[in-house]
């Protein structure tokens, strides 16, 4: 694997919150300037790591981390690989989680989607990965075929309707949001309670600024 691919993949979610996207939405609600985990990931590697000195990463890696989840497209092929890999990975992980939680069965996925993508996680990952490789060969960008891209988008839409908005999942998400918002409110007025005693002064200032 290319070193840049690996660096972007390892760094792209360093700024994520507890409870994933639910925690991200909670912080975005309460932070005066909003909160996006991809921007926080950049802050981690540029400011917070190495006692406030950052990791001295290349601009290509920083760009890939920042744009793996935003309106902008990564400037490099490596960044585009990670961005697309992230989409492929999390929708399949979410299916696994939903099955384990008893929210759905894989057999309930629409037949037309299973026909294109496959009937199991292994088949879906194989289809999606192979499609990206074949359709990106000798091209200046990383992409999928129209058929598979649309099937992936429809799968994500199905997950939003039947899983993410499911009353059970929604109830757990609401609890997570309240927890993060309550913690933020508490520490905002009790900064002395933050465990910063073993953190260097540059890092401490970066954390509270």
Q: Model-predicted segments: where are they?
A:
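Histidine-centered, transition-metal-coordinating active-site segments
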Residues: 35-196, 200
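An N-terminal structural lobe/cap that precedes and organizes the functional/catalytic core
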Residues: 4-51
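Short, function-defining helix-loop hinge/capping sites that tune catalysis or transport
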Residues: 20-21, 94, 102, 209
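Residue-level recognition of specific faces of alpha-helices
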Residues: 7-10, 64, 87, 207
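Single conserved hydrophobic/aromatic residue that forms the stacking wall/gate
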Residues: 1-3, 197-209
């Amino acid at each position: 694997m290319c070193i840049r691919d690996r660096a972007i993949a390892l760094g792209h979610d360093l700024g994520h919150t507890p409870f994933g996207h639910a925690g991200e939405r909670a912080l975005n609600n309460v932070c005066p300037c909003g909160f996006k985990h991809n921007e926080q990931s950049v802050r981690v590697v540029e400011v917070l790591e190495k006692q406030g000195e950052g990791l001295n990463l290349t601009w290509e890696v920083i760009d890939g981390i920042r744009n793996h989840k935003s309106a902008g497209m990564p400037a490099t092929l490596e960044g585009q690989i990670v961005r697309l890999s992230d989409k492929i990975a999390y929708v399949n992980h979410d299916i696994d989680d939903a099955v384990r939680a008893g929210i759905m069965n894989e057999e309930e996925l629409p037949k037309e989607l299973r026909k294109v993508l496959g009937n199991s996680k292994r088949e879906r990952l194989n289809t999606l990965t192979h499609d990206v490789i074949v359709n990106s060969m000798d091209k200046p960008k990383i992409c999928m075929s129209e058929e598979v891209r649309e099937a992936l988008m429809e799968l994500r839409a199905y997950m939003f309707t039947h899983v993410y908005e499911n009353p059970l999942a929604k109830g757990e998400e609401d609890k997570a949001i309240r927890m993060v918002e309550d913690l933020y409110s508490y520490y905002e007025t009790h900064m002395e309670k933050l465990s910063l005693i073993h953190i260097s002064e540059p890092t401490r200032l970066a954390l509270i600024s």
